[in-house]
């Protein structure tokens, strides 16, 4: 288990460089965040649709003190098959500048090109639309698969704050 965690920390730069992949997507999730947990089916759908097309996905658990066992239980409970990693030291949070869960960060050749919401289903905490009307992350992924050039963009993610490290 320790070897896996060390490998994940040691390969941060390599992961974000997207060698051979069209993009790397970090999906920041919180095990205790209701908004984040409600997005599990959508995140899994995006993974199943875009990973065969060259998009590399990782669930990122930024919770200090979270364990590999707790991460695996959460993944199982919510039906995730997306590869996951712990980010208790906030290396990925810092690199992406993520502040809430759920949030997505998309990197192409090591450059952050998107940070923000999955879609616009949540307008604010406690205020949700029945269905999303704008699918921000999916638009970015479709453009990456098509090889379109993109400028960096950011949207406001709604969810639970990522706890600061003391």
Feature names for model-found ranges:
Residues 23, 34-37, 65, 131-135:
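Soluble non-cytosolic domains of exported or imported proteins
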Residues 89-165:
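Thiol/selenol-based redox catalytic cores and closely related redox-interacting motifs
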Residues 37-78, 86-95:
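Structural microenvironment flanking redox-active thiols in thiol-disulfide oxidoreductases
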Residues 21-24, 53-57, 80-82, 101, ...:
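Loop/turn elements at helix/coil->beta-strand transitions in domains of secreted/extracellular proteins
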Residues 24-27, 56-61, 83-86, 115:
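Structural recognition of the beta-strand scaffold that forms the well-ordered cores
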Residues 30-34, 59-64, 126-130:
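Second-shell loop/turn segments in exported
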Residues 2-21, 28:
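N-terminal "domain-start" segment that seeds a small globular fold
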Residues 19-34, 141:
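Short active-site neighborhood of thiol/selenol oxidoreductases, capturing the structured segment around
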């Amino acid at each position: 288990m320790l070897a896996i965690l060390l490998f994940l920390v040691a390969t941060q730069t390599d992961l974000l460089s997207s060698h051979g992949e069209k993009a790397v997507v970090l999906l920041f999730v919180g095990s205790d965040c209701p908004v984040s947990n409600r997005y599990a089916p959508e995140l899994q759908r995006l993974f199943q649709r875009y990973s065969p097309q060259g998009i590399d996905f990782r669930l990122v658990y930024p919770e200090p003190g979270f364990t590999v066992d707790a991460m695996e239980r959460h993944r199982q409970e919510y039906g995730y098959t997306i590869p996951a990693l712990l980010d208790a030291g906030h290396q990925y949070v810092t690199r992406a500048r993520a502040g809430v869960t759920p949030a997505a960060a998309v990197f192409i050749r090591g450059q952050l090109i998107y940070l923000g919401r999955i879609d616009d289903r949540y307008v604010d905490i406690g205020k949700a639309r029945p269905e999303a009307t704008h699918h921000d992350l999916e638009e970015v992924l479709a453009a990456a698969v098509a090889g379109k050039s993109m400028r960096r963009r950011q949207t406001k993610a709604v969810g639970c704050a990522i706890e600061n490290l003391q």
